[in-house]
């Protein structure tokens, strides 16, 4: 594609993102900065349509970008991108990035002393608030281990099991027992489990207990077995994806202009399997990834785009976050939001 066609395609996509209306030759002449006749512009548009980068809606003389056109745009034409590739000379871009960073930092800092799960939920909400689309975070892959447990006697036959994970999350489960344990017995049992099994997965503890049951008193054995089963349930019963701002997408005409589009939109969030697959794929790559519906089989809605970035804890990638929005979104604004949030979430979780 020659430079003239590239400029016209870039201008067309920018105007369509800004206005949401098919773009005609008069608009391209006005905004492209090229001194071309309307006939020449129409010829170039015809060539771009043949190449599959733009299409003509039946109701308009103008053109709109196709998924292939958006792909070329985000890969080669964007003037903004992740922070580490923004030119330092671009003072305005740096000011925008700084403003976004301060907003994200303030949101995450207010939850910094809380569990990692709440910090992750705050990150999803921040992504949604700043982008005005849906924010999504794939939670860290869990080892289903525990750092320590505690027992709290609620009644003669009801005990509250408190499980603290290596990530600092706290989960609770109620255990029903046939034996009336005293508070001192519960402290003794918790101390034994923490001293011998702290830091292990519940599956590993289950295996160890099978070989050590003879050394324990019968009533302690049943309590520990119940604690292992309840604890395993507590740490594994966690939604792998946190989503915030789904309702904002109902206000996006491109995604909700018909009942069929609405049904497909709700299916995306109800099933989550497609989103999980997409987030898992993006966690294996470095930096910001852009997935465009109709162009990527990973995007579960043809009019949708997903911008993602992996986040780390202590230098190791543990999950992915991103923004779900329409294909017609301001990529140069949303990409830095995703990039900064991933970096600051990594920093916040690593300090936990």
From Swiss-Prot:
GO terms for molecular function: DNA binding. The keyword Repressor applies. Signal peptide: none annotated. InterPro entries: GAF-like_dom_sf, HrcA, HrcA_C, WH-like_DNA-bd_sf, WH_DNA-bd_sf. Keywords: Repressor, Stress response, Transcription, Transcription regulation. One of its GO terms (biological process) is negative regulation of DNA-templated transcription. The keyword DNA-binding does not apply. It comes from the Bacteria. Belongs to the HrcA family. Negative regulator of class I heat shock genes (grpE-dnaK-dnaJ and groELS operons). Prevents heat-shock induction of these operons. This is Heat-inducible transcription repressor HrcA. It comes from Ralstonia nicotianae (strain ATCC BAA-1114 / GMI1000) (Ralstonia solanacearum). The lineage of its organism: Bacteria, Pseudomonadati, Pseudomonadota, Betaproteobacteria, Burkholderiales.
């Amino acid at each position: 594609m020659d430079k003239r066609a590239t400029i016209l395609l870039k201008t067309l996509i920018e105007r369509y993102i800004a206005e949401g209306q098919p773009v005609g030759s008069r608009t391209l002449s006005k905004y492209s900065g090229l001194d071309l006749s309307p006939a020449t512009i129409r010829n170039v548009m015809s060539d771009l349509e043949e190449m599959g980068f733009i299409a003509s809606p039946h109701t308009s003389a103008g053109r709109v970008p196709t998924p292939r056109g958006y792909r070329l745009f985000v890969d080669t034409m964007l003037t903004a991108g992740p922070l580490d590739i923004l030119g330092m000379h671009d003072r305005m871009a740096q000011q925008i990035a700084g403003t976004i960073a301060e907003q994200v930092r303030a949101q995450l800092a207010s939850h910094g002393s809380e569990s990692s799960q709440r910090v992750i939920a705050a990150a999803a909400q921040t992504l949604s608030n700043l982008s005005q689309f849906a924010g999504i975070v794939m939670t860290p892959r869990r080892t289903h281990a525990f750092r320590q447990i505690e027992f709290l006697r609620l009644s003669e036959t009801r005990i509250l099991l408190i499980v603290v994970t290596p990530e600092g999350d706290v989960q609770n489960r109620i255990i029903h027992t046939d034996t009336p344990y005293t508070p001192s017995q519960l402290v003794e049992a918790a101390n034994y489990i923490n001293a011998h099994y702290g830091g292990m997965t519940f599956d590993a503890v289950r295996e160890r207990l099978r070989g050590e049951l003879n050394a324990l008193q019968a009533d302690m054995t049943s309590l520990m077995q119940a604690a292992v089963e309840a604890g395993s349930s507590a740490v594994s019963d966690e939604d792998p994806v946190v989503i915030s701002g789904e309702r904002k997408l109902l206000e996006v005409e491109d995604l909700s202009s018909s009942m069929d589009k609405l049904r497909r939109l709700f299916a995306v969030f109800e099933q989550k399997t497609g989103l999980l697959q997409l987030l898992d794929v993006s966690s294996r790559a470095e930096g910001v990834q852009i997935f465009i519906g109709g162009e990527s089989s990973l995007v579960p809605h043809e009019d949708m785009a997903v911008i993602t970035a992996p986040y780390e804890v202590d230098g190791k990638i543990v999950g992915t976050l991103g923004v779900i929005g329409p294909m017609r979104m301001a990529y140069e604004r949303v990409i830095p939001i995703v990039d900064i949030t991933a970096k600051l979430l990594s920093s916040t979780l690593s300090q936990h």
